[in-house]
Amino acid sequence: MNIKTLTVSEVTNYIKRMLDNDFILSNLSVKGEISNLKYHSSGHIYFTLKDSSGRINCVMFKSNAVLLDFPLEEGMEVIIKGRASIYPATGSFQLYCDEIRKEGLGDLFIKFEKLKEKLSKEGYFDEAYKKELPKYPQRIGIVTSPTGAAIRDIINVSTRRSSLVDVVLYPAKVQGSGAYKDIISGINYFNRKKSVDIIIVGRGGGSIEELWNFNEEELAKAIFNSKIPIISAVGHEIDFTICDFVADVRAATPSQGAEIAVPLSDNIKDRLLDISKNLDKYISDRLDTCRNNLSGAQRILKVHSPMAKISNSYLEVDRLQDRLNFAMRTKIKGEKNKVENLNNLLFAHNPIKVISKGYAIIKDNENNIITSKEQLNEDKNIEVILKDGNIEGKFIPSK
């Protein structure tokens, strides 16, 4: 039996025609849980529809996506109306969705919501417990896979932003059973060593199953108990994990985590320049204040110094001595004037001066001055004092 050899395109086109013409596959209603959700920039939506034992890739083109009245979410249980076909360029089987309606929440999403509610009630998400990131870290610890895109993105962004910050990697599994224990070990390692200023925990995007290790309660508590601030940088912007809520800062992607953690070199230089200027001004102001205080102290010291007091005492002694000399001169002059006045008065009443004018003083033999004839008896001895000498005689009354 001869079998015709077909090209790849012939095979894929044949299968596509078979599927497109199949009554059941061309008008399907399928129930499942959304996983690996991606909103494309073109407006198309790509995701995987899964249940406990199977999965199908799905696409909803923009023309139908704009009619959705709710946003699709990881773990959401939905019913899809559409058709099954293959994409000839890749030969991949997929569902082309015309309509999507909510059916309920998947098991993982329900588990996620329950843990989120539990931890929220216990205070693990409270802003009061969020640690502030240091503005100018020197070393940043990274807990992620050493071979994934996340570490490459973090290193590239960090290097571009600043050469002053060191990046230290703790290699950890970020996917698969028990990977969260590796991540916890990395957090504990950096806390034990105290060798970094910030920790970034992260990985690239993925389905809810692939990111599930970042929804484990043990990891959430390890992040909460870390003494070092932690940035959660898990998945893409639309991906949210428990780690995002409990971490001190949430970054939409690993690259954004590096941008948050690492300051630009220019900003650091500008900050250092500002600090230098402020320090110069502070030192200059302090020196001016010290100079003014020193000048004031010198003035006070000059006024209250012992030498100043001695100098003032010398001046006071000189002043008092001048006053004393003046008082003595004034007193002496006054006394001289008194003596001179008394002398003049004495001279004016001097008997010699009276005698010199032609008068005489008569004394009896008992040296009494005779001022009246009644004091004399006949033949009584007398002494007459004249200007140029004394004369003795006897008193003879006139007849």
From Swiss-Prot:
Against InterPro entries, the record matches this protein to:
Exonuc_VII_L, Exonuc_VII_lsu_C, OB-fold_nuc-bd_dom
Q: Which reaction does it catalyse?
A: Exonucleolytic cleavage in either 5'- to 3'- or 3'- to 5'-direction to yield nucleoside 5'-phosphates
Q: State the source organism's domain of life.
A: Bacteria
Enzyme nomenclature, EC number: 3.1.11.6
Does Hydrolase show up as a keyword for this record?
Answer: yes
Listed transmembrane segments: none
Q: What class of enzyme is it?
A: hydrolase
Could you give a single Gene Ontology term from the biological process aspect? DNA catabolic process
- Main localization of the protein? cytoplasm
Listed CDD domains: ExoVII_LU_OBF
Q: Name one GO molecular function term.
A: exodeoxyribonuclease VII activity
Query: What keywords are annotated for this sequence in UniProt?
Result: Cytoplasm, Exonuclease, Hydrolase, Nuclease
Q: Does the keyword NADP apply?
A: no
How would you summarize the oligomeric state and partners of this protein?
A: Heterooligomer composed of large and small subunits.
**NCBIfam families named in the record:** xseA
- Family membership: Belongs to the XseA family.
Q: Which protein, by its recorded name, is this?
A: Exodeoxyribonuclease 7 large subunit
Species name = Clostridium beijerinckii (strain ATCC 51743 / NCIMB 8052)
- Phylogenetic lineage: Bacteria, Bacillati, Bacillota, Clostridia, Eubacteriales
